[in-house]
């Protein structure tokens, strides 16, 4: 398949600027692959599609406030610093993106906070916008991390043109987020409320938690027409033995296994044994799933509506079937479903 197969016109007004008032009251499109049908529901109706013993695979990564605003020494120019990942805790080295990047050179110092209580020095250029920063801070490591949290902003995606609000800190986070390390939320999980999780539990549905720390690569546009030439950024992945046991037992008894989000799907597809069972994993993955792809574990998935030419859309095409996905997306646009991080959801069965 080619990149051009994933182009479609998405009206700007369908990009969700805000989340639904209640998590589980966003809209849900249910796409049935066997029947080729499309239904329109509310997200809380997802309960009707699962039975006792079915498993939902959840990504329990937690978004940290990765967007900082600082000032450059001497000129005082305002610089956005986006924390990508910690390289060395002891030396307080971080891989970051800076904007505007043009004048941020090795040796420059950046000051953060009204009282300049946090200082960082640029020690390397990694890409055109990428830099390595060393933070200069006298307190303990815990105090340093608290300072980053205090100064940082929730990293809502750039397509959202409004200012960040205090509500974003809560709503751009799943209710089951535990392991801090993501710079973007695994957005399919945002639709689950505490009440819905409880109802699923009462019905006998099980949860298998995996951790994939979502990086900014999730938003990277694909720039090659031949998809096999696209390279994904690596993301940190951890799958415990406990999660494997839950998923493999469900597979054995032929229960439904549902990947909640593209990140959960990438996680489990990155660690499949030759017997097509789930293996524990602790490392990095750069797996890129695009058509054709033979999925080993999940029998259904929940996902949001994605932007044109995104790697996320390519995975959906591989799982759903390209023609049915195109039909579903055309229907979503016609019915004015909301797209992207704060948008509506799709259940593919």
Curated annotation (Swiss-Prot):
Classify the source by domain of life: Bacteria
An annotated Gene Ontology molecular function: S-adenosylmethionine:tRNA ribosyltransferase-isomerase activity
- Single GO BP term: queuosine biosynthetic process
Q: Which EC number(s) does UniProt give?
A: 2.4.99.17
Reactions catalysed? 7-aminomethyl-7-carbaguanosine(34) in tRNA + S-adenosyl-L-methionine = epoxyqueuosine(34) in tRNA + adenine + L-methionine + 2 H(+)
Q: Does the keyword Oxidoreductase apply?
A: no
Entries under Pfam families matching the protein: Queuosine_synth
For this protein, the record's SUPFAM superfamilies field holds: QueA-like (SSF111337)
The record's section on NCBIfam families has: PRK00147.1, queA
Protein's name according to its UniProt entry: S-adenosylmethionine:tRNA ribosyltransferase-isomerase
Supply the source organism for this entry: Flavobacterium psychrophilum (strain ATCC 49511 / DSM 21280 / CIP 103535 / JIP02/86)
| Gene behind this protein | queA
